[in-house]
């Protein structure tokens, strides 16, 4: 199943997602999230972006892996009830990020180059990973969604003001995208 993406302005994107009860059957939802993410040509997708306020996100960073081989089990990841740890000291890197919920708006976001994340995988096995570079960036972006933070929140006030009309157009559903979006009217 392909879910419609929840756009900027919907209140669910500003909420803290609820932890998921250990052992909950998520397999169908997880597969649908990967299908939805791929249909929208995304690198990651958080459950709030499909209208589910739960602590779950999926990522696929295979386009950024330089080994020449796509290894689905290695690059397609599921993160349930994640806890992100930032290494100190850490190097901050900048990169222009997009977001499926805010189409057409790209923001230079400072992120930690290296992070550690503790989570449950799709089989409810506790995991811990150290991530660097693009995988670390994608995980930080999706993790932010679980706490109501969007990539535009990293903008200076003057830059955000310049984007006000574009953001309002997205909020009102006046945006063209090649994937399904859901405009429910539950605005912030």
Curated annotation (Swiss-Prot):
Q: Which domain of life is it from?
A: Bacteria
Which note does the record give on the cofactor? Binds 1 Fe(2+) ion.
Question: Does the UniProt entry include the keyword Metal-binding?
Answer: yes
PANTHER family found in the cross-reference section: PEPTIDE DEFORMYLASE
Organism taxonomic ancestry: Bacteria, Pseudomonadati, Bacteroidota, Cytophagia, Cytophagales
InterPro entries from the xrefs? Peptide_deformylase (IPR023635), Peptide_deformylase_sf (IPR036821)
What is the enzyme's main class? hydrolase
Q: Which UniProt keyword terms apply here? A: Hydrolase, Iron, Metal-binding, Protein biosynthesis
Pfam families found in the cross-reference section: Pep_deformylase (PF01327)
The EC number of this protein is 3.5.1.88
Role played? Removes the formyl group from the N-terminal Met of newly synthesized proteins. Requires at least a dipeptide for an efficient rate of reaction. N-terminal L-methionine is a prerequisite for activity but the enzyme has broad specificity at other positions.
Q: Name one GO biological process term.
A: translation
State the family named in the UniProt similarity comment for this chain: Belongs to the polypeptide deformylase family.
Q: What is this protein called?
A: Peptide deformylase
The active site consists of 142
Recall the GO molecular function terms of this protein's record. Answer: metal ion binding; peptide deformylase activity
What are the annotated disulfide bridges? Answer: none
**So what does this thing catalyse?**
N-terminal N-formyl-L-methionyl-[peptide] + H2O = N-terminal L-methionyl-[peptide] + formate
Q: What organism, scientifically named, is this protein from?
A: Amoebophilus asiaticus (strain 5a2)
**Required co-factors:** Fe(2+)
Q: Quick one: which residues bind Fe cation? A: 99, 141, 145
């Amino acid at each position: 199943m392909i879910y419609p993406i929840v756009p900027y302005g919907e209140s669910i994107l500003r909420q803290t997602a609820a932890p998921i009860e250990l052992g909950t059957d998520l397999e169908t939802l997880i597969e649908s999230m990967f299908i939805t993410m791929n249909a929208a040509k995304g690198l990651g997708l958080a459950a709030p972006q499909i209208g589910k306020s739960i602590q779950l996100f999926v990522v696929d960073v295979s386009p950024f892996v330089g080994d020449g081989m796509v290894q689905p089990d290695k690059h397609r990841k599921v993160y349930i009830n994640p806890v992100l740890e930032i290494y100190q000291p850490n190097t901050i890197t900048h990169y222009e990020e997009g977001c499926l919920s805010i189409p057409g708006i790209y923001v230079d976001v400072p992120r930690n180059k290296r992070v550690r994340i503790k989570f449950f995988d799709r089989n409810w096995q506790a995991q811990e990973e150290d991530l660097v570079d693009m995988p670390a960036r994608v995980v930080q972006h999706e993790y932010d969604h679980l706490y109501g933070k969007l990539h535009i929140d990293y903008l200076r006030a003057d830059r955000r003001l310049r984007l006000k009309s574009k953001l309002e157009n997205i909020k009102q559903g006046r945006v063209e995208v090649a994937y399904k979006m859901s405009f429910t009217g539950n605005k912030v």
